Amino acid sequence: MRDRRNFLARLAALGAALGLGATPADASAPAEARSSLLRDDPWVARLRGTHRVVFHSHLPTDGLALRWAQTFLDTQRTTYGVAEGDCSVVVGLNGRSIGWFFGDALWAEHPSIGEVMGTPGQSNPQRSLVNSLVSRGVILLACGNSIRASGQRFLPEAQRDDASARNAFAERVRATLLPGVEVVPSMVVTLQQAQDRGCRYIYAGG
């Protein structure tokens, strides 16, 4: 019997050393501490109304996500009599599609952007549409991960292996985004957040 008690004691000590009986820190913490770990990105506070939609694209597709956002608002108002104040429209771009959020200065500095977007030129052809959507309260979101990797997509091929060139390009992207565009950490999480808050998902990637 003594041997059995000694064995159980040693087993319990081993379990404690390995943390087998421990409770995860976040589960055992007070509710107030756990809630402090949860936060929304700033754009979430702008959601309004009962008609909510998120248009998503990772490919240029001639700015389809932007154009569909405009069509959604126009049709809701003119055909169904829905006021824009009762609509929340989110456009989330990642991958190559974030080029539509780049300012004209960056397009002029890097003609390779237009080539990647399928519209060679030194200015962003979607700039006026982006400005119009901003004025109508559309939430425009650019993926931070995609911005960080943007040099690998938009720089001339000869520069894409240059880490310093890629970093400089990403910094320039952030500095020259069109007014009204917000950067989110990760588009895949943003899409989940939007759908959790009642936004219907529409893929506009081609």
Q: Where are the model-predicted features located?
A:
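Surface-exposed patches in mature extracellular/periplasmic domains of secreted proteins
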Residues: 76-90, 142-145, 205
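A cross-taxonomic marker for long C-terminal extensions/tails that follow the last structured domain
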Residues: 117-206
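Acidic helix-start/capping segments at beta-turn-to-alpha-helix junctions
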Residues: 82-106
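Histidine-anchored nucleotide/phosphate-binding helix
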Residues: 63-82
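N-terminal secretory signal peptides and thylakoid transit peptides that target proteins
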Residues: 1-15
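A charged helix-plus-loop insertion that forms the helical arch/lid used to bind
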Residues: 105-122
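Short glycine-rich or small-residue beta-strand-to-loop segments that form or flank ligand, phosphate
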Residues: 52-59, 89-94
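C-terminal segment of N-terminal export signals and the immediately downstream linker at the start
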Residues: 21-51
